[in-house]
């Protein structure tokens, strides 16, 4: 398996949109809809590929913190992960972990001090285990809802 940072082109954009449509069809994330060009442009894109087949992706962008003083000083550079996706047929193979670690090392070289993300998965126990126990992230906040 090869993990690398990719530059966006029309062919890659089409593939990322197709993969995000697969994610939408899974109905595993509250409110998730497939991406369009504007969701992907201006992001750093990391891919997992094997024998010409895309196995997963991670994309996100660099920000400076504002009003996050409980965890970092305002103006601190951080990388916001927008999406991390692995195709269903290749889950539990360490691909998501590898994508995260590769992106972590890549953004660290540009002076990034934190990685942040939000998740709307319906399987919160599994995702918290993945991000906290397996990847070493810390829990910051939670937004809960109850339909009435």
Regions found by a protein language model. Name each.
Residues 24-49:
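Active-site rim helix/loop that mediates acceptor-substrate recognition in acyltransferases
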Residues 91, 116-127, 145-148:
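Conserved beta-strand-loop-alpha-helix junction that forms the acyl-donor binding cleft
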Residues 1-16:
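A short beta-loop-alpha structural element at the N-terminal edge
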Residues 47, 53-62, 80, 85:
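Conserved beta-strand in the GNAT
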Residues 86, 92-105:
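Conserved acetyl-CoA-binding loop-helix of GNAT-fold acetyltransferases
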Residues 97, 109, 113, 121-141:
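Conserved active-site alpha-helix within GNAT-family acetyltransferase domains
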